[in-house]
Amino acid sequence: KFHAYSTGWGPWAAPPAAGQILLDLRRMNRILEIDAQNMFAVVEPYVVAGQLQAEAMKVGLNNHISGAGAGTSVLANACCFQGGGPDCMYFASPQDSILSIEWVTPTGDILRTGSLGSGLGWFCAEGPGPSMQGVIRGALGGAGGWGVVTKIAIRLVHWPGPAVMPIEGTVP
């Protein structure tokens, strides 16, 4: 029996019973693409929101930062739990920013949603046929998911500020 869980906070951080394995996706931490013209990014599971934000701002774009902070996974916030935060009024809820998902099922099949599933790239959340987004998200995200998400395309928004945020500070 296979059941995928996020390695985030709470009881999902470790296998809950004997005979189970924990997949460590920590090395899957790359931003695979930032498409400035079409305003989206393709990321792996361990890309954190602050990492994506720093790169997106360089091309005049921005992404959602969850209420848990800039050190949380972009992918996990969008497709594995609610991931809300103070900027949801501007960005919409994270799950509404999903454009396409690639995930591996318990049988080893690779499934792709939206336009990616039709071989047309990462640009659109819905493709021909029924939407599969609800299957991977489940009732509350990863707790109801049916596989391991390996890549996600997430919608970005316009960033009117500087390409690099000026940082100043003093030690007390």
Label every PLM stretch briefly.
Residues 1-28:
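Glycine-rich N-terminal segment of FAD-binding domains in flavoprotein oxidoreductases
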Residues 38-40:
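Short, solvent-exposed beta-strand edge segments and adjacent coil->beta transition regions
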Residues 31-34, 43-45, 49-172:
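FAD-binding subdomain of flavoenzyme oxidoreductases
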